[in-house]
């Protein structure tokens, strides 16, 4: 029961700061019912005539004006899900309190109060208050910072609004939370559906609804109303729902519901209540913390039995065991985790890296393989139209003009190639083409066909279909070519000629796109994919995208950091290999998409580990490669910004996208780069490792210190005629130690700790406890001997002196361990802690030494230590530090150091 509560708490700890977009968990709601009234409303909207729609939402084809928008927003609220609404401060305070560690301390405090140990109860209450308030303050600051970070990468929608008092309208790009029912929006490939919509116009619109239905294949949406065959609104052709994604095509649609009134909004509360599988970070924190709690639950009864049996005072033994249990409870862990992750996220933002999901920071630091596309990552992402040629490689204005018509009139997702074509055509030619040719229709791009077409007309008698796309996909639908001004069959001779010319262009680092046309009699009705047949290959347009100057040094830096870079691209293998050569990346043997389809998972997994460059890949190829690399034990990052990258982004341990990416890519990513650069990424990786290293410090310190303390207590309890330390001493010591840990998130990290990927290793933690825990016990036992034989504190009458002596040694050694374990180097000489941590530990040590001499000493049942004690104290601490350093050197040589 307790483990279940604890695991749930750890799983949701980071998500309270930066809410994960609910989409990834939504597929769990396939069989979750929504209110019947919502289903009925959606079914009604699906078949409602368009004229009635305008009246229902008090809108019109020209769009809403500002007054109408404000009225609608006042009525329906902002377009935000319930999970995105901020909770009141008292709810946050309660959430910060109700972690398992505080609950455990509260129970122990209640027992102390019931047994009339009011001082112990007060100290425990103070510990709980400090832990809760520090966590609350840190989360409040982190939430504010996280909101600012999220605002930097917010999604937008293109909406039709009245823009002035004259009633003129225009298309505006606004944040999706500003949409209101009645708005008219545009949709294109790659867009996330921002609200529940009724389709008004659509061209080959295919939407992925897997997030709501679990169906992997996209479904077509149309503006044609018909009575639904089923009572499930998700199957209505005229409706699109928030959280789904446009795969291909274009559309105009009316917003019919926003925020928690949407289908997804009704499910959001239930989605958030359902448990998702914990990731590696959450599992690691959970395992470590449960290890410490189990250790406490086992050792406290053992301490009780030994003290009760040897001393005969079971009441005092129970209080002492209770205090030991308090000391073994890692109550500061939630604050340390929260503070470290949040501070890391803020620091990453200064490196132009926005963390959407805080627990992704650990994977960022653990990443050992980075899969990335070529375009814009290795290259400048400033594509220039270099050539426009016929099939023989001769410059052709006809090919350029055909490409311009295609790029100018297509309304889908305009990529950099379209922009380069439009910019590469002179203004006079562009004006002439626009005046002569009118658009009739278009067949949008999709990643299955890898081409797109527009249909244009110069007169009323004929239409011309202009198609451009990947060379092989265009050749698949061509039967003829234009050669020396004549149309000839596409035979083997021509295919060899085409391959020779395009290979030459590819070897020059040029990306080749084929252009084909087809003349058709003018007709009514829409054009379909089937019309892309028997085309005439006109020629090619070739683009240059030179490598960035920063790519080569960034690749070297990533390699030095232990990260292997693999290129996963849809481009030609010749172009990709040329770019890899220019940036100093050894491509080796190139694997292409068609080869992958013939391989089993085991074969591809082995091949993927030794291959650097994959070319001509589909989105599913990329996803499969990433999944298999993960299966082999790698922590895999994937960097992409296109629709075709979304499956791989979701499959990766850490999805990385850029601010200018399509909506679906940004939604799927864990981390957003404000600058598409491997150098920025490398800096982010290093910061991620620093964050993880500081979090690991607290866990290692706590684990080893607790192990040593319990061992010392057991030895003392077995042989001393009195308690080695009173319960309140243990509580005060633990309280002071907690204070010294507050500054750990601000600590420095040695360079060698960030030179390689860092991962959770529970086995290493257990080994670390066994190695370093008993060291403090050795010097604790020496202290027992010192107080017993040198200072003759060996009777119940002199036990206060004994307890005061061990109180100071225990507190100082426990505080010094912070400096000893934070680095593999020699502390204070080769590696210094940050000033905040140094100041906090010095203050705690001074307070610890001063307490036996202070006016509080009698109340705390401590006594002033003789001056002769302090040379021994220095010797014990020096010996402790020396032995720890020697063991640390052996340990790091044998097992390494995280």
Could you describe each region identified by the protein language model?
Residues 103-123, 163-166, 291-329, 342, ...:
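Helix-interface capping motifs at the ends of transmembrane segments in multi-pass membrane proteins
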């Amino acid at each position: 029961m307790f483990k279940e509560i604890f695991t749930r708490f750890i799983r949701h700890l980071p998500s309270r700061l930066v809410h994960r977009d609910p989409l990834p968990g939504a597929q769990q709601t396939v069989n979750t019912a929504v209110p019947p009234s919502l289903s009925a409303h959606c079914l009604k909207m699906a078949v409602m005539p368009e004229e009635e729609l305008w009246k229902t939402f008090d809108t019109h084809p020209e769009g809403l004006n500002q007054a109408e928008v404000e009225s609608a927003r006042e009525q329906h609220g902002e377009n935000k899900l319930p999970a995105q609404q901020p909770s009141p401060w008292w709810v946050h305070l309660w959430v910060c309190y109700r972690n398992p560690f505080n609950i455990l301390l509260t129970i122990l405090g209640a027992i102390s109060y019931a047994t009339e140990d009011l001082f112990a109860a007060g100290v425990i209450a103070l510990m709980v208050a400090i832990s809760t308030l520090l966590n609350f303050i840190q989360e409040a600051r982190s939430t504010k910072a996280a909101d600012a970070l999220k605002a930097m990468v917010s999604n937008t929608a293109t909406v039709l609004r009245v823009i002035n008092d004259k009633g003129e309208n225009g298309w505006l790009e606004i944040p999706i939370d500003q949409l209101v029912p009645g708005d008219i929006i545009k949709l294109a490939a790659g867009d996330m559906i921002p609200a529940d919509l009724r389709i008004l116009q659509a061209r080959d619109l295919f939407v992925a609804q897997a997030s709501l239905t679990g169906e992997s294949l996209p479904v077509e949406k149309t503006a044609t109303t018909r009575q639904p065959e089923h009572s499930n609104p998700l199957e209505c052709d005229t409706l699109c729902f928030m959280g789904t994604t446009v795969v291909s095509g274009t559309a105009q649609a009316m917003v019919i519901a926003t925020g928690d009134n949407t289908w997804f909004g009704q499910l959001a509360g239930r989605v958030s209540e359902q448990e998702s599988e914990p990731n590696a970070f959450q599992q690691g924190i959970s395992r470590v913390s449960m290890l410490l709690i189990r250790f406490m639950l086992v050792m406290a009864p053992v301490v009780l039995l030994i003290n009760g049996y040897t001393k005969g005072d079971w009441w005092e033994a129970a209080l002492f065991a209770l205090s030991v249990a308090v000391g073994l409870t890692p109550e500061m862990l939630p604050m340390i985790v929260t503070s470290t992750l949040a501070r890391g996220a803020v620091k990453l933002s200064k490196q132009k890296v926005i963390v959407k999901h805080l627990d992704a920071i650990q994977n960022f630091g653990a990443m050992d393989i980075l899969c990335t596309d070529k375009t814009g990552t290795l290259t400048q992402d400033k594509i220039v139209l270099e050539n426009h040629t016929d099939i023989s490689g001769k410059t052709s204005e006809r090919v350029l003009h055909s490409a311009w018509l295609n790029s100018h009139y297509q309304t889908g997702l305009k990529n950099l190639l379209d922009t380069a074509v439009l910019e590469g055509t002179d203004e006079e030619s562009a004006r002439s083409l626009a005046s002569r040719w009118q658009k009739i229709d278009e067949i949008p791009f999709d990643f299955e066909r890898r081409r797109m077409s527009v249909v244009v007309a110069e007169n009323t008698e004929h239409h011309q279909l202009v198609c451009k796309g990947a060379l092989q996909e265009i050749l698949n639908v061509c039967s003829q070519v234009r050669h020396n001004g004549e149309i000839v069959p596409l035979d083997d001779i021509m295919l060899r000629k085409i391959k020779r010319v395009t290979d030459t262009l590819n070897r020059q680092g040029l990306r080749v796109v084929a252009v084909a046309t087809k003349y058709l009699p003018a007709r009514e009705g829409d054009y379909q994919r089937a019309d892309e047949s028997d085309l005439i290959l006109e020629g090619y347009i070739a683009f240059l995208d030179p490598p960035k100057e920063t790519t080569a040094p960034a690749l070297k830096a990533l390699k030095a950091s232990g990260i292997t870079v693999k290129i996963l691209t849809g481009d030609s293998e010749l172009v990709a290999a040329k770019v890899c050569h220019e940036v100093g990346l050894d491509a080796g043997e190139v694997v292409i998409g068609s080869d992958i389809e013939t391989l089993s998972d085991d074969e591809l997994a082995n091949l993927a580990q030794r291959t650097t460059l994959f070319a001509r890949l589909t989105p599913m190829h990329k996803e499969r490669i990433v999944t298999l690399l993960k299966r082999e034990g790698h922590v895999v990052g994937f960097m992409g910004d296109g629709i075709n990258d979304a499956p791989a982004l979701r499959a990766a341990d850490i999805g990385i996208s850029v601010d200018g990416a399509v909506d679906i890519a940004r939604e799927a990513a864990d981390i957003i780069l404000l600058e598409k650069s491997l150098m920025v990424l490398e800096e982010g990786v290093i910061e991620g490792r620093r964050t993880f290293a500081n979090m690991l410090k607290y866990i290692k310190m706590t684990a080893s210190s607790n192990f040593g303390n319990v061992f010392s207590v057991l030895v003392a309890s077995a042989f001393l005629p009195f308690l080695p330390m009173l319960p309140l001493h243990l509580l005060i010591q633990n309280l002071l130690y907690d204070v010294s840990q507050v500054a750990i998130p601000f600590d420095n990290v040695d360079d060698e700790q960030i030179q390689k990927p860092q991962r959770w290793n529970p086995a290493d933690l257990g080994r670390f406890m066994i190695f370093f825990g008993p060291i403090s016990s050795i010097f604790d036992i020496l202290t027992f001997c010192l107080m017993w034989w040198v200072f003759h504190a060996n009777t119940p009458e002199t036990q206060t002196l004994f307890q005061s002596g061990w109180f100071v040694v225990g507190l100082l050694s426990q505080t010094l361990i912070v400096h000893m374990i934070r680095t593999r180097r020699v502390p204070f000489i080769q590696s210094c802690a940050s000033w905040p941590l140094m100041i906090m530990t010095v203050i705690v040590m001074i307070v610890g030494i001063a307490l036996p001499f202070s006016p509080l000493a009698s109340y705390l049942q401590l006594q002033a230590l003789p001056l002769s004690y302090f040379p021994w104290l220095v010797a014990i601490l020096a010996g402790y530090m020396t032995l720890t350093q020697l063991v640390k050197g052996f340990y790091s040589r044998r097992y390494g150091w995280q």
